[in-house]
């Protein structure tokens, strides 16, 4: 059973996926019901975080075995009382995997609420804390140090600074507020920094904020795979025509030994 509501897309994306999963060839091969089941299964999986957090090791600075040991020690500091393994990828020698634990369905929900935007919500599900720019609204009397329940406004309908929100929201877990409501919404200038320190997330995934920054790069698995498929060699010239914050360019440089 899905823990979160089914993901919703922009019209163009929905139309494309419908054509892919409900085309005549697929329905002929699988049958109408099986094709629909696969489509709904995709939507359910996309509503939840991946089963593993993937990190790429900077093999120029240290061995994978050494970084694996350091990372395990860092994760144990975050997850006191839990033994979360750090695994080596069976095919990609520079990748470490950390299993994501969840969803944790029995977390208590507190009266004080904090609503965050959808993008911030996605980051929280992947192990991030809540930073001030992601906060959309809070309950009326939230103070620094309060226990709060954090929710994502998945439809983008909550008004900034609202004291209550009865729209569609998804529970992300519990945290401790680092600031009061007035500090968040009545500041004379833009605020940065930590807003809510998550202590009981629905999905338990390590935070990589300042965790071994010179040794690790938090990177989604598909972005890693493409560099290995390319198999760049030292001395070659590589033109990256899709250079975005996915880490592919630096990975290519690492595989080429910066040559």
Predicted stretch roles:
Residues 1-259:
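SAM-dependent transferase fold signal centered on methyltransferase-like domains
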């Amino acid at each position: 059973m899905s823990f979160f509501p089914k993901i919703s897309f922009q019209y163009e994306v929905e139309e494309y996926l419908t054509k892919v999963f409900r085309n005549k060839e697929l329905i002929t091969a699988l049958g109408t019901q099986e094709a629909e089941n696969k489509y709904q299964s995709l939507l359910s999986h996309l509503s939840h975080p991946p089963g593993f957090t993937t990190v790429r090791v900077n093999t120029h600075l240290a061995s994978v075995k050494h970084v694996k040991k350091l990372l395990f020690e860092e994760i144990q500091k975050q997850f006191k009382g839990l033994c979360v393994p750090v695994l080596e990828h069976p095919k990609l020698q520079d990748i470490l995997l950390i299993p994501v634990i969840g969803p944790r369905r029995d977390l208590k929900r507190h009266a004080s609420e904090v609503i965050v935007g959808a993008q911030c919500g996605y980051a929280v599900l992947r192990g991030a804390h809540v930073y001030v720019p992601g906060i959309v609204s809070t309950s009326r009397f939230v103070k620094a140090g309060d226990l709060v329940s954090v929710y994502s406004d998945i439809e983008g309908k909550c008004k900034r600074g609202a004291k209550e929100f009865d729209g569609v929201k998804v529970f992300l877990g519990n945290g401790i507020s680092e600031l009061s409501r007035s500090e968040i919404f009545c500041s004379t200038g833009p605020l940065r920094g930590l807003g809510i320190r998550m202590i009981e997330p629905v999905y338990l995934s390590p935070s990589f904020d300042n965790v071994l920054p010179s040794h690790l790069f938090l990177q989604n698995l598909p972005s890693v795979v493409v560099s290995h498929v390319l198999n760049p060699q030292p001395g070659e010239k590589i033109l990256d025509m899709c250079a975005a914050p996915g880490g592919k360019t630096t990975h290519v440089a690492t595989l080429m030994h910066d040559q």
